[in-house]
């Protein structure tokens, strides 16, 4: 279970899918996330605590149905956990600040890292560089 949300937010404000993804380690259905096709320049934050996680320059279209990035904004912004669910080994990624579930990282991304951070839109908050507008996933 992820840590409590920051004082300006509370768990009751999360939608059912946001709560399922971030607090219960769930996964949204592919190709349904609000931020999948977002092309604006800006920063992707943790929905729960607003920790900066990814910048738009590292986002790419992997075709997998979830927003994909080739690297986090900072090494400390992400926490990595071995995940043996579904009879396979994967690397789960969580917010390094509040422990909210974000998605998984796979070794099949583009250069320069070769990694694909496959992230649930429902775990993200996007802040537009142009106008500061925020869009919750």
Curated annotation (Swiss-Prot):
Cross-referenced SUPFAM superfamilies: Mss4-like
This protein's UniProt keywords: Metal-binding, Oxidoreductase, Zinc
Which cofactor does this sequence's record say it needs? Zn(2+)
Q: Explain how, and how many, cofactor molecules are bound.
A: Binds 1 zinc ion per subunit. The zinc ion is important for the structural integrity of the protein.
**Reactions catalysed:** L-methionyl-[protein] + [thioredoxin]-disulfide + H2O = L-methionyl-(R)-S-oxide-[protein] + [thioredoxin]-dithiol
The record's listing under Pfam families reads: SelR
| Active site residues according to the UniProt entry | 118
Q: MsrB domain: which residues?
A: 7-129
UniProt cross-references to PROSITE patterns, sorted A to Z: MSRB (PS51790)
Quote the gene name from the UniProt entry: msrB
Q: What class of enzyme is it?
A: oxidoreductase
Q: What is this protein called?
A: Peptide methionine sulfoxide reductase MsrB
Q: Does the keyword ATP-binding apply?
A: no
At which positions is Zn(2+) bound?
Answer: 46, 49, 95, 98
Q: Which family does it belong to?
A: Belongs to the MsrB Met sulfoxide reductase family.
Task: Kindly state one GO CC term assigned in the UniProt record.
Answer: cytoplasm
Name the species this protein comes from: Yersinia pestis
The Enzyme Commission number assigned here is: 1.8.4.12
The processes (GO biological process) annotated in the record are: protein repair; response to oxidative stress
Molecular function GO terms recorded: peptide-methionine (R)-S-oxide reductase activity; zinc ion binding
């Amino acid at each position: 279970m992820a840590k409590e949300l920051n004082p300006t937010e509370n768990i009751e404000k999360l939608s059912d899918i946001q709560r399922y993804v971030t607090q219960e380690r769930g996964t949204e259905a592919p190709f349904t996330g609000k931020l999948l096709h977002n092309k604006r320049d800006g920063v992707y934050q943790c929905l729960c605590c607003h920790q900066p996680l990814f910048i738009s320059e590292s986002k790419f279209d992997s075709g997998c149905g979830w927003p994909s990035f080739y690297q986090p904004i900072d090494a400390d912004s992400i926490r990595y956990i071995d995940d043996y669910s579904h009879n396979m080994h994967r690397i789960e990624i969580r917010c390094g600040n509040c422990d909210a579930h974000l998605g998984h990282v796979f070794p099949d991304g583009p250069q320069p890292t070769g990694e694909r951070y496959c992230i649930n839109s429902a775990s993200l908050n996007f802040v537009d560089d142009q106008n500061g507008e925020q869009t919750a996933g």
